[in-house]
Amino acid sequence: MHQTSNIRPLKASEPNSPMSRRSFLAATAAVGVTATALGRDQGPSPAPTRYPDPNIVVLDKRFARYKVSNTPIQRLYTGTLWAEGPAWSGVGRFLVWSDIPNNVQLRRLDEDGHVSVFRSPSHYTNGNTFDWQGRQVSCEHGTRRVVRYEHDGKVTVLADNWHGKPLNAPNDIVVHPDGGIWFSDPGYGTLGNYEGNKGELVIKEAVYRIDPNGGKMEIVTDAMYKPNGLCFSPDYKKLYIADTGATHYEKAPKNIQVFDVIDGRRLGKGQEFTHMDLNGKAGLADGLRADVDGNLWVGAGWVGEGYDGVHIFAPDGKRIGQILLPEICSNVCFGGPRRNRLFMTASQSLYAVYVETQGAHIS
């Protein structure tokens, strides 16, 4: 197990797990905008995009270095109802993501682009990630729990209650090199039957840490309205959390907060990292990931043309770029053999674009 004292950003060529890809696939088999953005043909045979892609927008010169001039934004798959939770398996070389209303997880193989149903039913899974042993960890709306899929196909329940009271509906999830699992619990999956099972929220919305030694749960913060997407900085010294409480709380901010991580286990007092206002309009940040330089790539939307897609923020909190999509972007992750491809779940579709940076973490 990795120790906190040895934490460092991943290198591009570093393997994610000691397992071989062949053995990993065998194990998982046991488990079963602008006018331009809106007008682009995203059908099965779209017209070619003239380079540079006009929907990769530089807002600050610092973003120019991350834009690949001769690559397009590609729609890799469509047909979902609300796509969420993209996670890259470096061992299996595949992407998994959730289609929450359809109660399935989907998998896309990197080598040939084949997409198939990975798990059905998925218990209305939302966020997914992979741990340091290559095991998938997921947030289930329908059962209000966090689970880990073992290599032999068994399911281990990591969390389903707080002091005997059911969780709200775990949403997004990340892993720490010490083996700890951190997840948000805003409760969207219990607000209706479309993305889970309608029920009552009986505990405060919060972010939790599951200790790797014994599985003890702790609240690391409950100071936000509805904590949603979350990610660590490259050195794991900071935790960024998107607050989407404005969906249900009138006074809730539309922002991303940042917290100091203390001893790898606790959080210091949070403060605003950035707000989601752009040109007088404010949407919501959702899922987010950090690159090796500490920039945040944030799925955003609910405004429309010229806003929906991915917003990129420098470590100082300034918005430096956008990737405009014709759909609301719920979440992102870096993947591909070199971790230089940004995958974006966006409402009914999965998109991807190559970038001149790499993801800071394993999934």
Task: Mark where each language-model region is.
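Blade-edge beta-strand/turn elements of extracellular beta-propeller
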Residues: 63-78, 114-121, 152-164, 208-226, ...
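N-terminal twin-arginine translocation
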Residues: 18-23, 32-46
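Blade-level signature of beta-propeller repeat domains, shared across WD40, Kelch, NHL, RCC1
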Residues: 333-363
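N-terminal secretory signal peptides
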Residues: 1-19, 30
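Short loop/turn segments immediately following beta-strands, especially the blade-tip
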Residues: 259-265, 355-360
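A short loop-to-beta-strand structural motif that recurs across blades of beta-propeller domains
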Residues: 104-106, 145-147, 206-208, 255-257, ...
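Blade/loop signatures of beta-propeller domains
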Residues: 43-71, 362
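Beta-rich, blade/repeat-based domains predominating
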Residues: 79-93, 121-140, 145, 163-181, ...
